[in-house]
C-alpha cells in the first residue's frame, strides 16, 4: 500500500536536511498517515481510510460526507 492519503492525495515531499556545518543531504518528508475506521452517516456504514492527520482534523470539523463531497470523492466506491 502506498503512502498516500486516500482523501487529499497528500504524498511524501522531497526536502533537504541541513547540518550545523550547512552540509545538505536529501531527505524524504513522509505524510503523517493514520489508518482510521470512520462512520459515514449518509451511507450508514463504517469506512476504513488511510488519511493524514490534517484530513482527520478537517473531518472532525466538517464531517466525513461534506468533506468528501468538497473534494469530489464518492465514498460509496471506497
Curated annotation (Swiss-Prot):
Domain of life per record: Bacteria
GO cellular component: ribonucleoprotein complex; ribosome
Signal peptide boundaries: none
Swiss-Prot/TrEMBL keywords: Ribonucleoprotein, Ribosomal protein
GO MF entries: structural constituent of ribosome
GO terms, biological process: translation
HAMAP family referenced in this protein's UniProt entry, alphabetically: Ribosomal_bL28
UniProt family annotation: Belongs to the bacterial ribosomal protein bL28 family.
PANTHER family xref list: 39S RIBOSOMAL PROTEIN L28, MITOCHONDRIAL, LARGE RIBOSOMAL SUBUNIT PROTEIN BL28M
Name listed for the protein in its UniProt record: Large ribosomal subunit protein bL28
The organism of origin for this protein: Synechococcus sp. (strain CC9311)
Gene, per the UniProt record: rpmB
